Design a protein with these regions (language model features):
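Histidine-dependent nucleotide/RNA phosphoesterase domain, centered on the 2H-phosphoesterase fold
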Residues: 1-202
Length: 202
């Protein structure tokens, strides 16, 4: 998608998309969890991703600068593999707001990738995140009855189950646009760049 500077500001973030196989497993996990947690707002499977860096609202002309800034990372960063497993919540079980499934595996390489992205974008005016990066896929958002949801999660044993969904291959980075509608956030891929490949993709 070619962007023009006349467009209004865009709400964007960098993330890793899920494979079709992993997305199907997420759908099945959400289906199973719905039986115990009918009161939460489930994220649409096509919207689930691994966020690397949230940029917020930027002028459309800034998008190409962002892609140029991460070009050295794209050409030198080796792909890595994560294991998607283990349920958890933010901020805590007493009143959870987010239900997620976590990532294990090559976390040190992932943290290094995120750190490199932070460093590349800071000169453009994007400050590093204050909170430590915690890799996860958001499965559901809890807006009402969150203390009840916390009780269900505590007594059901769901958080103790491994819930291993398989591998997430981090071999490309996608710049997404986020638009909020009455149906929730809708994400549009603006550009996807493969890792460790020579040549311009901007």
């Amino acid at each position: 998608m070619k962007l023009h500077s006349k467009q209004k500001s865009l709400r964007v973030f960098l993330a890793v998309e899920l494979s079709l196989d992993l997305r199907r497993k997420v759908v099945e996990l959400q289906r199973q969890l719905r039986e115990s947690l009918p009161m939460v707002n489930w994220v649409r499977p096509e919207s689930i991703h691994l966020t690397l860096k949230f940029l917020g609202y930027v002028d459309a002309s800034m998008v190409e600068l962002v892609l140029t800034a991460i070009e050295p990372i794209r050409t030198s960063q080796l792909p890595l593999t994560l294991q998607v497993q283990g349920l958890g919540v933010f901020p805590h079980l007493r009143r959870p707001r987010i239900l997620w499934i976590g990532c294990t595996g090559d976390i040190s390489a992932l943290l290094n990738l995120v750190s490199r992205i932070e460093g590349a974008l800071e000169p453009l005016g994007f400050p590093p995140e204050v909170k430590p990066y915690f890799p996860h896929l958001t499965l559901a958002r809890i807006k009402h009855d969150n203390s009840q949801v916390g009780g269900v999660l505590t007594h059901s044993g769901l958080l103790e189950q491994p819930q291993d969904l398989g591998m997430l291959h981090v071999d490309r980075i996608t710049l997404f646009r986020s638009e909020v509608s009455q149906f929730g956030a809708e994400y549009t891929a603006l550009r996807t760049v493969p890792l460790n490949e020579p040549g311009p993709h901007i």
